[in-house]
Amino acid sequence: DEVQAALSGQFDTGATAHELTVGTSAFRRVVDNRTAINEWIGSGNIDSEPEDFARYDGPLNDSHRRLDSRQYGLFFNDRISFNEQWQTVLGGREVRLDERTFDDQGDTGRHTRRYEFLPQAALIYKPVSNLSLYTRYSKGLSLGGTAPWFASNAFEILAPTVSRQIEAGIKYDWRRISLSATLYQIRQAYQYSRPNDDGTFTYVQQGEQKNTGLELAANGWASERLQISASVAAIRSRVTGSGTAEYEGHQTINVPTLRASLYGDYALPWVDGLAVLGGVQYSGKKYASQQGNVQADAYAIFNIGSRYSTRI
């Protein structure tokens, strides 16, 4: 659940124009789970026709609260225009985090209380009206991961983590299409099941995952009736400081090196308000194991549909 109140306004300080937004927010997230039931019912190979195993039909365990997370924040954002070419955006959010986790008996497992300031800043330069160059830095607060069932701390919910993103890009408006290129880097805590000497695993936050990418995109109207959205991104993802050498030095699990998408929305000329939709999402090969010794093939997902809009 989330509630937010904000106040926006414009004013000048000499030759400098300001677009200021200030506000407050409150966010609450609760997680209620049943204790998992794990029973061995057989085994099979994914390369062959899957076996038909009988489904579990026994009683379910009681549901209980595992997480109660609350965030209270004050935020501001000021877009400052110095002239027609130069702008800057300065802002931030002060967050008060109060989060509790609970075990199967309802006792408090972790109680995290802390303040976190999440700044954001951007510098924008427009040499001409339809061309923008920018650089941006931001800091975010991400939800902590949940330990898998096989970990020694199974179903434990870890504390929220702080991520940092820096990017630089260029945007060009050509006719009714917006073209952009963005170079970015995201740093975040690495959350994974760490192998122990006794053969067990413990789900931890240790080390850092760094994603560096280049994304090209085009959005807008290709014709009077056809609207398109296209993007392609190359991503390099690495883990450092995890304490597990086999998980480092290669592309991070489940992160493809190439990703692309294309969507179209075409308004049919013979029926007012009726349009056909279509798109494709492509994901390149990616590792399916943290050691980087098992690889999942590339795949594409196709979508097709229609929409109709009218006024009543």
Enumerate the predicted regions with their spans.
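Face-selective signature of the C-terminal outer-membrane beta-barrel domain
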Residues: 1-103
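Residues on the lipid-exposed face of transmembrane beta-strands in outer-membrane beta-barrel proteins
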Residues: 5-9, 74-80, 121-125, 168-172, ...
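Outer-membrane beta-barrel strand-turn architecture
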Residues: 11-14, 80-84, 117, 125-129, ...
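Membrane-embedded beta-strand positions of outer-membrane beta-barrel proteins
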Residues: 20-24, 90, 121, 135, ...
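Transmembrane beta-strands of outer-membrane beta-barrel pores
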Residues: 24-30, 94-98, 137-143, 174, ...
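Residues that define the transmembrane beta-barrel architecture of outer-membrane proteins
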Residues: 68-72, 113-117, 162-166, 173-175, ...
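Gram-negative outer-membrane beta-barrel transporters
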Residues: 83-85, 178, 185-187, 204-290
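Membrane-embedded beta-barrel scaffold of Gram-negative outer-membrane proteins
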Residues: 126, 132-137, 159-221, 233, ...
